[in-house]
């Protein structure tokens, strides 16, 4: 019973609590709604006030901007009006200037018309005077023809002939003086260039040798070199083409031969055999082959070093090797490689003085005797062989012509070719460059004079400049100018056929005619 009552009481209390809570929440919600409405009204009022303020501010800014634009427009209109006024003033000034120029031109036109009228009048006067002068000249010519018994054409021919004779003589004198002066200046310049080139080029004195000497540790080695029944020495001589001279010279073997490359190969091979101690035909053959390879490599190195020293680049490798062979070639005792380098230096120096291509000149000078490296192996002169080599390896046409013309076989086609020939003569002619015994030298001078004096009409001959020139004095009443040229050619041919000489020999025939008169 009591529990049921408590349950009912609890339910009743819960119901009352729920009703009370409902009304409380409702009153709270209504209060919040009223607060929110009031807040919204307040915000709306503030927004209206701010909008009104912004509207007034925008109106004020718009008024200021309108005022500013109006002011700028007024200033721009004022500036344009001022500029238009200035342009109008300038146009008015130009118009005034044109009016003044127009007046000036009118005045000048009037003056020119007056001058033209004056010139027409003067021209008429001149024509009248010319007519009168022509009549007077005609009368004078007629009178002169009557007095001199010569027509006008005859008199003109006489005067022109006399003038032509006088002018021709004066021109001939002037031409001769110019030629003499030009020759003197050219000779002077050539001497300066040659002296400068020779001063700046230093070269060695060389001498020819046809033997080499190999030193031995003792004389017992000579027997080992000879071998049993001479088989070792025969093998070495057969393989190298060099004669071995074993005599009483202590501790030395002499190698004799005219081919320097073979002689050098034999020397190196024999030196290696002596150092090795094993000397028999098989070992000799091995050492000779090894020495040939060493000599070939040395020749190539010499060629490369030569081109580097002279400053010539771009040569074909085969041509460099052929150039190195010149180290073992001599001409009248002068080493051909040293001679070629000397010619290259001299040609380059002279070309530089004349404003020519110095590098091309050195190249031509270095290769001018390239044919001498193999002229003993190939048919033909060293000039022909050199031209073939240069053409084969596509050298410059100037280089080819320099090789072909440096001994006068063909005409030089460039200044460099002439310089190469001059440098070749300088290198060969300098003291000590080429060896020649005193006996041969004197015999050659005597033979030169003997050949020259063997011709009819020759009065006297002189061999000068160490036998490099022969001067022949002829009788002018027996030998005329044309005969003098023929005589020089004949003597030159006989010298070439009958004499052996280094370099060139210049043949000069001198015919002197003297006319003497005595004024009393």
UniProtKB/Swiss-Prot annotation:
Q: Which residues form the KH domain?
A: 210-273
- Describe its membrane topology: Single-pass membrane protein
InterPro entries (alphabetical): HD/PDEase_dom, HD_domain, HDIG_dom, KH_dom, KH_dom_type_1, KH_dom_type_1_sf, Ribonuclease_Y, RNase_Y_N
Entry's localization field = Cell membrane
What keywords were assigned to this record? Cell membrane, Endonuclease, Hydrolase, Membrane, Nuclease, RNA-binding, Transmembrane, Transmembrane helix
What molecular function terms (GO) are annotated for this protein? Answer: RNA binding; RNA endonuclease activity
UniProt GO cellular component terms: plasma membrane
PROSITE patterns recorded for this chain? HD (PS51831), KH_TYPE_1 (PS50084)
Q: Where is the HD domain?
A: 336-429
Under the heading Pfam families, the entry gives: HD, KH_1, RNase_Y_N
Please state the span of the N-terminal signal peptide per the UniProt entry. none
Residue ranges spanning the membrane: these are: 4-24
| Region (Disordered), start-end ranges | 86-116
GO BP term, pick one: mRNA catabolic process
Q: Which domain of life is it from?
A: Bacteria
What exactly does this protein do?
Endoribonuclease that initiates mRNA decay.
Q: Which family does it belong to?
A: Belongs to the RNase Y family.
Q: What is this protein called?
A: Ribonuclease Y
Organism name: Bacillus cereus (strain ATCC 10987 / NRS 248)
Primary gene name: rny
């Amino acid at each position: 019973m009591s529990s049921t009552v408590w349950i009912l009481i609890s339910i009743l209390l819960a119901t009352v609590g729920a009703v009370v809570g409902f009304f409380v929440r409702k009153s709270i919600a209504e209060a919040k709604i009223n607060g929110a409405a009031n807040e919204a009204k307040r915000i709306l009022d503030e927004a209206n006030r701010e909008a009104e303020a912004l509207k007034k501010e925008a109106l004020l800014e718009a008024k200021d901007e309108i005022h500013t634009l109006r002011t700028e427009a007024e200033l721009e209109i004022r500036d344009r009006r001022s500029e238009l006024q200035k342009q109008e003033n300038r146009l008015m000034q130009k118009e005034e200037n044109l009016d003044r120029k127009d007046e000036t031109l009118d005045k000048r036109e009037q003056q020119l018309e007056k001058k033209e009228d004056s010139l027409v009048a003067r021209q008429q006067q001149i024509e009248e005077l010319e007519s009168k002068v022509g009549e007077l000249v005609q009368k004078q010519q007629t009178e002169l023809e009557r007095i001199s018994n010569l027509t006008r054409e005859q008199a003109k021919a006489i005067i022109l002939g006399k003038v032509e004779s006088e002018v021709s003589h004066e021109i001939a004198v002037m031409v001769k003086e110019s030629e003499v002066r030009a020759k003197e200046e050219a000779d002077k310049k050539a001497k300066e260039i040659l002296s400068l080139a020779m001063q700046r080029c230093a070269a060695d004195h060389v001498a020819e040798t046809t033997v080499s000497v190999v030193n031995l540790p003792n004389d017992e080695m000579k027997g080992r070199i000879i071998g049993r029944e001479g088989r070792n020495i025969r093998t070495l001589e057969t393989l190298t083409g060099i004669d071995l001279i074993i005599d009483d010279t202590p501790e030395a073997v002499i190698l004799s031969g005219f081919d320097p490359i073979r002689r050098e190969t034999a020397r190196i091979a024999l030196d290696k055999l002596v150092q090795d101690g094993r000397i028999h035909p098989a070992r000799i053959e091995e050492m000779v082959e090894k020495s040939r390879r060493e000599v070939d490599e040395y020749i190539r190195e010499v060629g490369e070093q030569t081109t580097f020293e002279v400053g010539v680049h771009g040569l074909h490798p085969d041509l460099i090797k052929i150039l190195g062979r010149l180290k073992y070639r001599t001409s009248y005792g002068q080493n051909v490689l040293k001679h070629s380098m000397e010619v290259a230096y001299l040609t380059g120096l002279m070309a530089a003085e004349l404003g020519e291509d110095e590098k091309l000149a050195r190249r031509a000078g270095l290769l001018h005797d390239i044919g001498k490296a193999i002229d003993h192996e190939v048919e033909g002169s060293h000039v022909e062989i050199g031209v073939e080599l240069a053409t084969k390896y596509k050298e410059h046409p100037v280089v080819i012509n320099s090789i072909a013309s440096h001994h006068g076989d063909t005409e030089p086609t460039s200044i460099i070719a002439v310089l190469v020939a001059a440098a070749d003569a300088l290198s060969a002619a300098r003291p000590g460059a080429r060896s020649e015994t005193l006996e041969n030298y004197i015999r050659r001078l005597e033979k030169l004079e003997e050949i020259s004096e063997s011709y009819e009409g020759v009065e006297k001959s002189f061999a000068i400049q160490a036998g490099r020139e022969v001067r022949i004095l002829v009788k002018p009443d027996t030998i005329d100018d044309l005969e003098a040229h023929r005589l020089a050619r004949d003597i030159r041919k006989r010298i070439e056929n009958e004499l052996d000489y280094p370099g060139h020999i210049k043949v000069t025939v001198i015919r002197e005619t003297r006319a003497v008169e005595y004024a009393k």
